[in-house]
């Protein structure tokens, strides 16, 4: 299913991939609002669905892109989005998620002081914002 494969977009290739390059080049930047997100944590040896929130318990805004496309069978105009991901191997919380042998990735919740910069960025500036330093403090939550 196409939609299932495109809910996350790798920041390293977002400008090149056919699914995303139009949205990226047109600067269709968005913020996806969430109270938390979930990732599998394998520290116990088994996959445990783990809730991740901001340490201050405030909702977060995840760096995303959006675009429109026409559904071929119905002609309906569809608005869709994808959250951007980065390497998380150096993030104190996110590097603990996913299988030990798997690549560590994370979506990019942005610090509030970066919202306007993200939404009004050039592609180069947007790419520069997609890094671990842009992420507010995160914690595992119940």
Regions found by a protein language model. Give the residues of each.
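A structured binding-face within diverse protein domains that lines the active/interaction site
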Residues: 1-142
């Amino acid at each position: 299913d196409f939609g299932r494969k495109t809910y996350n977009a790798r920041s390293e290739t977002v400008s090149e991939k056919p699914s995303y390059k139009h949205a990226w080049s047109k600067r269709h930047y968005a913020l996806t609002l969430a109270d938390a997100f979930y990732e599998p944590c394998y520290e116990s040896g088994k996959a445990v669905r783990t809730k991740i929130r901001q340490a201050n318990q405030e909702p977060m805004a995840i760096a995303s892109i959006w675009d429109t496309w026409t559904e071929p069978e119905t002609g309906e105009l569809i608005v869709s989005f994808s959250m951007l991901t980065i390497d998380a191997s150096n993030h104190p919380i996110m590097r603990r998620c996913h299988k030990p042998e798997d690549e560590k990735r994370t979506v990019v919740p942005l610090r509030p002081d970066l919202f306007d910069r993200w939404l009004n960025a050039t592609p180069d500036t947007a790419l520069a914002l997609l890094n671990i330093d842009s992420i507010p403090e995160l914690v595992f939550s119940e």
